[in-house]
């Protein structure tokens, strides 16, 4: 039985190296003026200049959660996942999502499947308050068994409102926003462990929470120093806010039961769990310590389950109460 994500077939380190090889070719593919890149180290979305602001763009897919959702006849929500994985990245740079397009690759045409995917995509865009502008459908039986779903989101942010992590400082408060489950990461390992229990299955395929409305409300009221969308790599996403600091999580959010079950079932080491899954933590917000109470009150009014989970310290990396 697989005890790590790599043993299940996904080597995060190898994936990072492959991505770096791709990104290394990007430098010459730029322009000047409108469309010129605005570089963010480890940013969650790409930014290009446009007038007095910046266009934010990101692309992502749902991954092998699609297979589990298909097995459990829950395909009506994977469109929400697809939107969420993109718009939650956009807001990390301060951008408001405006438009979304999808890409569906199919082994064979399937009208019922497409209707379910479309319903989820539309619901996700409603939750994110962005326009579902179109997309592309490709029937490619030589390439795909079943189907795949991905999408691209575009947003806008004024130049002065870009969140680049430069305001992060020692003693900043870290606020955690609860996830709705594994969201859309770790499913290659999850599928190796899942035993068919319907109650657990419902937890595992719950759609990824969309934080757009609550975070945009927070950005309008509080000076946010940085945001991190906790996706693939788990806690490793926190230093993406600014790698020059140490992120101390000494009061973590409760771990949902599904993660406890996965850990026991697979006999997975805690460090591997926190590297693979969000463990109940969907988004992290860094604010000045003096703004933490007001930020928590606002997030509660917006319907988020949020709490003070830690602080920023001198150093590098992440310290977590469950791993010390």
Language-model-derived ranges and their functions:
Residues 1-30, 35:
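N-terminal amphipathic/basic leader segments beginning at the initiator methionine
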Residues 2-7, 24, 112-131, 140-147, ...:
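Glycine-/charge-enriched secondary-structure boundary and capping motifs
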Residues 11, 60, 171, 229, ...:
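Residue-level signature of catalytic and energy-coupling elements of molecular machines
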Residues 24-180:
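Glycine-rich phosphate/pyrophosphate-binding loop regions near the starts of catalytic domains
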Residues 52-57, 61-63, 191, 253-263:
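Acidic-glycine-rich active-site phosphate/pyrophosphate-binding loop
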Residues 62-65, 158-161, 182-184, 235, ...:
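Short, acidic Gly/Pro/Ser/Thr-rich loop/turn segments
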Residues 168-198, 202:
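Acidic, glycine-rich loop-and-beta core segments that form the ion-binding/anion-interacting portion
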């Amino acid at each position: 039985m697989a005890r790590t994500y790599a043993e299940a077939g996904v080597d995060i380190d190898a994936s990072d190296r492959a991505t770096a090889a791709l990104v290394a070719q990007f430098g010459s593919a730029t322009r000047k003026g409108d469309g010129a890149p605005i570089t963010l180290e480890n940013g969650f979305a790409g930014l290009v200049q446009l007038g007095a602001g910046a266009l934010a763009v990101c692309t992502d897919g749902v991954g092998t959660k699609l297979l589990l959702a298909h097995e459990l006849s829950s395909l009506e929500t994977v469109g929400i996942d697809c939107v969420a994985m993109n718009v939650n990245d956009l807001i990390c740079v301060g951008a408001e999502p405006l438009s979304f397009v999808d890409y569906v690759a199919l082994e064979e045409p399937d009208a019922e499947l497409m209707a379910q995917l479309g319903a989820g995509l539309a619901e996700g865009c409603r939750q994110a308050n962005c326009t579902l502008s179109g997309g592309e459908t490709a029937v490619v039986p030589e390439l795909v068994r079943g189907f795949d779903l991905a999408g691209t989101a575009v947003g806008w942010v004024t130049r002065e409102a870009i969140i680049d992590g430069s305001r992060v400082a020692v003693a900043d408060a870290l606020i955690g926003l609860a996830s709705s489950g594994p969201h859309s990461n770790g499913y290659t390992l999850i599928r190796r462990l899942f035993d068919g229990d319907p109650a657990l299955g419902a937890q595992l395929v719950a759609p990824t929470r969309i934080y757009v409305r609550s975070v945009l409300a927070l950005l309008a009221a509080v000076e946010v120093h940085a945001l991190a969308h906790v996706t693939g790599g788990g806690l490793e996403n926190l230093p993406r806010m600014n790698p020059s600091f140490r992120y101390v999580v000494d009061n973590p959010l409760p771990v949902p039961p599904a993660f406890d079950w996965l850990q026991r079932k697979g006999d997975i080491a805690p460090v591997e769990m926190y590297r693979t899954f969000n463990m109940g933590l969907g988004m992290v917000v860094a604010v000045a310590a003096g703004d933490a109470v007001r930020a928590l009150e606002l997030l509660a009014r917006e319907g988020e389950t949020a709490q003070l989970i830690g602080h920023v310290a001198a150093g590098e990396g992440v310290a977590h109460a469950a791993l010390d």
